[in-house]
């Protein structure tokens, strides 16, 4: 039906997103005749390139694969197509099979559908269960636990190659995806009443929730965890840490769901050695009036489990 036509897609370069689109695109072309032309750019450049292209009306790209947090910036000026009627008419899409959060939040704005989720982005903590079991250690339930475990394993040979390895591997590269990770670390110190209570701003008065002991605690974690990571940790991103973790060089990491299939892929050194869990939390949260950390109680932290 679409023989001779080409669709231009922009996303981040490298294997993590661009390559899977190319791989699946081959089957798409077989089914439709529509060819796919991929443009891969550094993660730090995707937003600006899309915004510039759309705003100038150049229209070099038909499709963008990007984090949903940017969606509103493209919708309000009218750059994205309202997909609502097309989605509802396409029975093969099976829209209701998409998890409600990603269907209603990540893909929709103001009651209309503007994007199709490629995956469901949420962070998890991953750990070498073989190492922790051998040492009689439990997986981390708090970020303090995470640091304690990372310190314990740092500098030890974790994959049997005779070289010292690392307690923790986190992608901290500037203009990379490290800001997602530090937000996940800060969240339990800032937000204890559910997502409606806000994280970056207090919804009651719109004052920033940054200059407080909670975010300071997250930055302290960032600094200390660097002591237990690869020597170049401040210059690596998640694409690098995934390879480090699956080669057996890291006791802990924080990532999206990608670690799961990568850990059991051909060549992985950690097959059947990886555990995962909901992100560690905190036994303290900020008092929003004072900005100080206070201990969790049932009223302060109603969603806590065992005080975390």
Q: Predicted regions: what is each one?
A:
Residues 150-152, 197-235, 275-286, 294-305:
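Glycine-centered hinge/linker elements that transmit conformational signals in sensory
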Residues 215-218, 223-226, 240-266:
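Glycine-rich, aromatic-lined ligand/substrate-binding cores of catalytic
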């Amino acid at each position: 039906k679409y023989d001779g036509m080409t669709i231009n897609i922009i996303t981040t370069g490298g294997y993590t997103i661009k390559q899977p689109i190319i791989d699946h695109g081959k089957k798409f072309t077989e089914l439709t005749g529509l060819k796919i032309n991929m443009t891969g750019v550094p993660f730090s450049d995707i937003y600006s390139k899309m915004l510039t292209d759309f705003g100038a009306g150049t229209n070099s790209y038909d499709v963008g694969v990007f984090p949903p947090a940017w969606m509103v910036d493209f919708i309000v000026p009218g750059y994205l197509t309202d997909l609502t009627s097309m989605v509802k008419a396409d029975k093969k899409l099976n829209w209701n099979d998409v998890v409600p959060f990603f269907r209603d939040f990540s893909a929709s704005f103001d009651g209309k559908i503007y994007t199709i989720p490629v995956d469901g982005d949420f962070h998890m903590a991953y750990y070498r269960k073989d190492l922790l079991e051998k040492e009689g250690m439990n997986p981390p339930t708090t970020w303090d636990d995470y640091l304690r475990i990372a310190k314990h394993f740092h500098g030890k040979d974790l994959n049997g190659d005779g070289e010292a390895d690392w307690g923790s591997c986190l992608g901290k590269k500037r203009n990379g995806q490290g800001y997602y990770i530090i937000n996940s670390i800060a969240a339990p110190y800032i937000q204890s009443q559910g997502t409606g209570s806000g994280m970056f701003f207090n919804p009651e008065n719109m004052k920033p929730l940054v200059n407080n002991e909670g975010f300071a605690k997250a930055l302290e974690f960032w600094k200390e965890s660097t002591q237990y990571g690869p020597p170049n940790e401040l210059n690596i991103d998640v694409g690098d840490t995934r390879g480090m973790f699956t080669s057996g060089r890291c006791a802990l990491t924080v990532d999206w769901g990608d670690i799961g299939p990568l850990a059991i892929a051909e060549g992985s050194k950690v097959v059947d050695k990886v555990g995962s869990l909901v992100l560690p939390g905190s036994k303290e949260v900020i008092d929003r009036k004072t900005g100080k950390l206070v201990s969790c109680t049932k009223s302060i932290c109603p969603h806590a489990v065992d005080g975390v």
